[in-house]
Amino acid sequence: AVYANIKKFATYIFASNIPEIVPFITFVLFKIPLPLTVMQILAVDLGTDMAPALGLGAEPPEHGVMDKPPRPKNKRLLDVPLLLRAYCFLGPIEAVACMAGFFFIYFQHGWVPGMVMPDSGVIYLTATTMSLAGIVATQIGNVFACRTERESVFKVGFFKNKLVLLGIVSELIIISTLIYTPFLQRIFGLAPIGLKEWGFLFAFTPVLFLMEEGRKWIVRRWWS
């Protein structure tokens, strides 16, 4: 169980690397304002991600784990399936949410492709806030998804791991404190966002979770 939980922890953490990298790639390739700053990345890696990730360490073993043969001694912890799941499936979904949130603010203020995008001021700060909050929103879906590798989370009990739930509450408190505390806004380059913006971002939370549930179903069905 310890080995499996370390893999779940790693998958959860690695997935957020993609929405942290994609904004820099778009900044360089498409000459748009930087959608996510270094300080905002640190807010994720050293702040919002920590408590939910630790909650995964308390995840009970999946059903049937004792029926499986022992893993080879030379089997790596960071294997190809783990990296593919984090970097090629979960991470890209998070990156879509991150960038969608960023452009959502510009579209709200009348921007259309071809126009210059402001790289300072309230519009820009609000847009980068959406990028950060988009990562947090999808990481909530991700921490539920990472509770199992193959089995459906609905089968193991959606709210069974209380530490994961406490981690999510902690994550929401941290991101809310960063976004709505004036002196922290200045440090992290953030601006307040409203219920409509939160609703847009949290629409991606079940999308990621359900897409991962679908992937697990395919794995169970075809690679049992």
Where would I find each of the regions flagged by the language model?
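Membrane-embedded transport module
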Residues: 1-151
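C-terminal transmembrane module of polytopic membrane proteins
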Residues: 15, 57, 133-224
